[in-house]
């Protein structure tokens, strides 16, 4: 089979349909978000971010988004409490907007 007809067999993949299956360990979340493990531990407890796992915390894509929103808010000058509130409000608004679509 020539390569062009092999390529014709393929279809685009919508990765957003699979994001809910992603599981990240603490170190991976820290690397993506650009924060320390100590910060992530503290933020996870303070913001009550849901994780899986018993021996090691496992973060899903929603938890990663929350961490990144908190980081963004802190980078813009908010204290941790205000950053957590802003992240929660942003996610609630985003969820509301996606339900309306």
Task: List PLM regions with ranges.
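Arg/Lys-rich, alpha-helical DNA-contact motif
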Residues: 1-31, 45-50, 61-101
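Key DNA-contact positions within bacterial/archaeal DNA-binding proteins
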Residues: 38
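Short, Lys/Arg-rich nucleic-acid/phosphate-binding segment
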Residues: 53-58
